[in-house]
């Protein structure tokens, strides 16, 4: 019998899995939901996402009923405000949202940049730290928040709707911009006051492996699961992957996908203005993270725009060739790799080509994208070293199915060993052992 029913909820789909430790016994087909992009906005309909969760679980069939607990791994931030009945007053606003630049500036200016970093562990990055989103709604849609009884991230929403509990974990709390991330000792009165909100509408923070609550009868009927089934509080998807990688101090975990996320595990967090610092979610460990917001998505954007007649296999072959060969002699084209903005900056940069001439070819443009991305990947290592945690030389790598990880690690200085891990988020959930509060 599977011990855990795992739910991996990303920015476009939900996968449910039956887990026995780190073994995946079965997985559902992906249940997709739509993220609405409008300018700098990125929103998900909460009811549509909840329906996708139910679809994924039911995709496992009768076996899903024979588990001991449910465990969650979610995208983050995914901010939402709820009323007294647990109904959403706002859309779920995801980490891809960039509408709140002005609000981010205001939060940092009022409290001071150094003070915010020292309290929260991060600067108030638009969308990446959800206090900026909360500030935007307070200013632009105050009516939506007048009846707010609970405000949190996706795991809080799921618990409120499925178990009736009001909980979150330290990894999610870290990215609210309101939590004492570096000490893990609760919500910060100073940060809440800076935003102008009350701690009363915030969830209780407990470790990710703590049972947040049991499924209500209504939720059990909707999901096809037993009423009362324990649901763990859950954690961020990247934390689940780090657990599978070992979560040892100095461990690097690199998720190479549409976004490229490089995380360092530490027991002594040292905030840096160009890094995201957050709790692991269990125990007293933290992750310090550097992110390229558009990695594979930048390459496949180039395929759609410049090489629409090429097959995927031909395109990937050319990526490898260009990576080995480098730019042609005399080529002056350069690429700034910010097609999806920058996760660790308040002022949002944009992607750009420079050095174009009448001799520039589409191959030059693709080569420039590769060079810009590989350089940006390598430039993250000095930032992580600056935290004072010694980096282990074996890097756990997830999401490298297209072998883009080899491309992205090309310019890393020194000797490294790369250890592929598959299904990292789902398998990491299987390592959480349920415990009572």
What do these predicted regions represent?
Residues 1-91, 102, 220-221, 225-233, ...:
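N-terminal glycine/serine-rich phosphate-binding loop of ATP-dependent small-molecule kinases
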Residues 62-95, 120-128, 159-180, 204-208, ...:
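Short beta-strand-loop/turn "lid" adjacent to the catalytic site in phosphate-handling enzymes
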Residues 65, 200, 389:
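Structured loop/turn residues at beta-strand edges in well-structured enzyme cores
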Residues 195-207:
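A conserved helix-loop-beta module that forms one wall/lid of the active-site cleft
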């Amino acid at each position: 019998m599977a011990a855990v029913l795992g739910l991996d909820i990303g920015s476009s789909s939900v996968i449910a899995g039956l887990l026995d430790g780190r073994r995946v016994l079965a997985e559902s087909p992906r249940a997709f939901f739509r993220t609405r992009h409008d300018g700098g906005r990125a929103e998900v309909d909460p009811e549509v996402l909840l329906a996708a969760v139910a679809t994924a679980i039911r995709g496992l069939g009768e076996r899903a009923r024979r588990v001991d607990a449910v465990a969650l791994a979610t995208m983050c931030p995914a901010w939402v405000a709820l009323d007294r009945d647990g109904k959403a007053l706002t859309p779920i606003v995801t980490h891809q949202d960039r509408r709140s630049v002005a609000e981010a500036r205001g939060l940092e200016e009022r409290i001071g940049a150094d003070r915010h970093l020292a309290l929260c562990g991060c600067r108030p990055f638009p969308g990446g730290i959800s206090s900026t989103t909360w500030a935007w709604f307070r200013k632009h849609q105050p009516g939506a928040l007048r009846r707010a009884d609970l405000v949190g991230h996706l795991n809080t929403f799921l618990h409120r709707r499925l178990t009736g509990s009001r909980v979150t974990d330290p990894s999610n709390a870290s990215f609210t911009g309101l939590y004492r991330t570096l000490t893990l000792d609760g919500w910060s009165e100073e940060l809440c006051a800076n935003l102008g909100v009350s701690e009363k509408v915030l969830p209780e923070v407990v470790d990710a492996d703590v049972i947040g609550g049991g499924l209500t009868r209504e939720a059990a009927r909707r999901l096809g699961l037993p009423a009362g089934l324990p649901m763990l509080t859950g954690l961020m998807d990247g934390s689940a992957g780090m657990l599978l990688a070992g979560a040892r101090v100095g461990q690097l975990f690199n998720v190479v996908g549409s976004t490229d996320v490089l995380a360092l595990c530490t027991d002594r967090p040292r905030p840096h203005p160009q890094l995201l610092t957050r709790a692991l979610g269990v125990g007293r460990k933290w992750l310090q993270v550097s992110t390229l917001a558009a990695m594979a998505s930048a390459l496949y954007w180039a395929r759609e725009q410049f090489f629409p007649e090429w097959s995927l296999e031909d395109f990937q072959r050319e990526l490898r060739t260009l990576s080995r060969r480098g730019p042609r002699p005399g080529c002056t084209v350069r690429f700034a790799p910010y097609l999806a903005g920058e996760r660790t900056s308040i002022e949002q940069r944009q992607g750009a080509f420079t050095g174009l001439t009448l001799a520039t070819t589409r191959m030059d443009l693709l080569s420039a994208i590769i060079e810009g991305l590989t350089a940006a990947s390598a430039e993250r290592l000095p930032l992580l070293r600056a935290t004072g945690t010694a980096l282990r030389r074996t890097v756990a790598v997830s999401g490298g199915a297209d072998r883009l990880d080899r491309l992205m690690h090309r310019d890393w200085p020194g000797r490294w060993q790369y250890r592929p891990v598959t299904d990292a988020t789902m398998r990491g959930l299987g390592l959480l052992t349920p415990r009572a509060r």
